[in-house]
Design a protein with these regions (language model features):
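N-terminal helical capping/dimerization or prosegment-like subdomains
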Residues: 2-76, 239-243, 257-260, 334-345
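Metal-dependent amide/peptide-bond hydrolase catalytic core
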Residues: 4, 167, 176-352
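Predominant activation on well-ordered alpha-helical scaffold segments within soluble catalytic domains
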Residues: 14, 34, 107-110, 114, ...
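A structural signal for short hydrophobic beta-strand segments in well-ordered beta-sheet cores
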Residues: 44, 87-89, 224-227
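Active-site metal-coordination/substrate-binding segment of hydrolases
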Residues: 62-127, 334
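Hydrophobic/aromatic beta-strand patches that form the interior of the parallel beta-sheet core
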Residues: 65-67, 129, 154-156, 315-317
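Active-site metal-binding loops of divalent metal-dependent hydrolases
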Residues: 71, 134, 160, 186, ...
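Acidic/histidine-rich catalytic neighborhood of metal-dependent amide-processing enzymes
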Residues: 102-174, 178
Length: 352
């Protein structure tokens, strides 16, 4: 990249940071991205708070690669010591909410797309999609535009991975479980106290082990994350509500895991959604071979992204470090941002 292009990329990231873009409230950052497309002469489409564009010489006879990252953020961590919406550049870092997750990846993919937008001699088409509601796996994010896009053969999802290539990603089921008992006054004996059943059921979840252990993602992980019961000190509640977080490796189908819990769990249990399945791409895929030639490390990701909503092959890669995501005083290194653009280009040059 030229110095001017580097400055432009940094400037765009800072504009994005300055603009609050909480999930479901991304309208203002979308305006910034629309302006960027217009300034660069790129035709785009919009649905809700999602934008996408095709390369200028899109050819339906060619396979298509989707480039995707999100522009929504979580609420700022309460431990911030700086203004989360003021993009300070200091010590080679750009600070601000969404700088790392996933502003850096989004900007890197936009400048990658800009560099190939006018190319006529590519083996693939490219679509760039800047999408909403990733942080909440919302219905009005990438899921809402998939049917509006041409057939996608493969996707690159931009998330902070230190430019390592995530070739597998855990799926997620959140279960709401209910332990039933008999309500009554605390002064009287009660042999059907829902709270007293809790330790045995918690132990069932804690002892749970699934046979298939992934080399990339490890075992299926089951964690009770919330417990709620009672409303008054002298009343024995009729039920205890618990929330269970289940992270699924690529060796299981999400419906298989759901069926197990529904039939085997010692209390009532129901999944909130079965949309966030695990993902995995064949090690023989062209993008994996390209990464190997460049010495890019592959790994399995424990964190969730929009990959879970896709029904075509995908990988996750981007500048930044996922450990900084959702943290106080979030930041990305300037070099990570600019190097990310070049790594994306090198990765695709091997196949396009």
């Amino acid at each position: 990249m030229t110095d001017n292009q580097s400055k432009d990329a940094i400037k765009l990231l800072k504009k994005i940071i300055k603009t609050p873009s909480f999930s479901k409230k991304e309208e203002n950052v979308v305006k910034i991205l629309e302006s960027w497309f217009k300034e660069n002469g790129i035709n785009y489409k919009r649905h809700l708070n999602n934008l996408w564009a095709e390369n200028k010489y899109f050819n339906k006879k060619k396979p298509t690669i989707l480039l995707n990252s999100h522009h929504d953020t979580v609420q700022p961590n309460k431990s911030y010591t700086i203004d989360p919406f003021y993009p300070i550049e200091q010590d080679g870092k750009i600070f601000g909410l969404g700088s790392n997750d996933a502003g850096g990846a989004l900007v890197s993919l936009l400048y990658l797309f800009k560099s190939i937008y006018l190319s006529q001699k590519m083996n693939y088409n490219f679509i760039i999609a800047c999408t909403a509601e990733e942080e909440i796996a919302g219905a009005n994010g990438i899921k809402s535009i998939l049917e509006k896009l041409p057939k996608i053969d493969f996707a690159i999802i931009g998330e902070p991975t230190l430019m390592k290539l995530s070739i597998a990603e855990r799926g997620l089921i959140v279960f709401d479980a209910k332990i039933k008992g008999k309500p009554g006054h605390a002064a009287h004996e009660n042999k059907d106290n829902a709270i007293e059943k809790l330790p045995k059921i918690l132990n069932w979840f804690n002892q749970l082990k699934f046979d298939r252990v992934s080399k990339l993602l490890g075992p299926v992980k089951t964690t009770v994350t919330q417990i709620n019961a009672g409303f008054q000190h002298n009343v024995i509640p009729s039920e205890v509500d618990i929330v269970v977080d289940v992270r699924i490796n690529e060796l299981y189908d999400i419906n298989e895991i759901n069926d197990f819990f529904v039939t085997q769990c010692p209390c009532q249990i129901k999944a909130r959604s079965l949309n966030l399945g695990p993902s995995f791409i064949s090690p023989n895929h062209k993008i994996i071979k390209s990464a190997n030639l460049l010495g890019i490390e592959s790994y399995g990701s424990p964190t969730l992204s929009d990959q879970a909503l896709l029904d075509f092959p995908s990988v996750k890669i981007g500048p930044g470090n996922s450990k900084r995501s959702h943290s106080a005083d979030e930041y990305i290194y300037v070099d990570e941002l600019l190097d990310g653009i070049e790594v994306y280009k090198n990765l695709l040059n091997k196949i396009i």
